[in-house]
Amino acid sequence: MGSSARTLRNWRGLRTLKEAVIDRDDYFNLWSYNMKFSEDTINVLKNFSTINPSILFKPGQILSTVSPQKTIMAKAVIEEDIPAKGGIYELSRLLGVMSLFEDAVIQFKETHMRVQDSKRAVNYTFAEETMIVTPPEKEITFPNPEVEVTAEWNDVQGVLRAAGVMQLPEIALSGKDGNVLIEAVNSKDPTADIYSVTIGETDKEFRMIFKTENLKLINYNYNIKISSKGIAQFESTNQVGPKLQYWIATETNSSYGG
């Protein structure tokens, strides 16, 4: 009895017994918290897997990724609340596993993610954080943009399709003759064909060039901000579904004349 009393007195010096029980309950509730990924969130994860094959889940409603070359960074605000941290080395493989279940329920465990339904279950082991290329913790401070324009997805998609059909390796956002154009181009060949769509007006002259493979965007309309410092921000304007932001580096032969 005396020994137990001494132990409880020591506990009270740090926290009450009630607090200790609450902490214990929170701990076990964390690892038994059931959640499901919506179709929108699955689509975000599929998109992010094309940017970086790995991802680090963090507590909260934000998913983020960065390409291994650090030329693309993306962030999505999703409807689900991720309960704990967990690294996934092969995101496309995890998505494939989840597709085996008709109505997958997900639990974040200490060392793995458990995917299950009424009959089946998979324990998917987390990867070490050091194995995953992750975005910086600090939020991006985007420079004051010299150009800002809104692009409809149909126009962006049309130019990307044209680039594929015409075998053009780059997409350009250009300001010329008072218009903002999105173009499929080959900037290294001045005689190459150009496919262009007018998406706005401007009084500036510029040509910001992106590798086609770097424009890994989900099908939304976007507000595009362009900085002469070599970066562009694409922010989705959708009112329903995940809010997305992409930061994409421009190629070194981009130009801004003001």
Kindly give the residue locations of the regions a language model identified:
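DNA polymerase processivity clamps
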Residues: 12, 19, 25-126, 145-258
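Serine residues within intrinsically disordered or low-complexity segments
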Residues: 3-4, 32
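Short hydrophobic transmembrane-like helices used for membrane targeting/insertion
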Residues: 1, 21-22
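Long, charge-dense
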Residues: 131-149
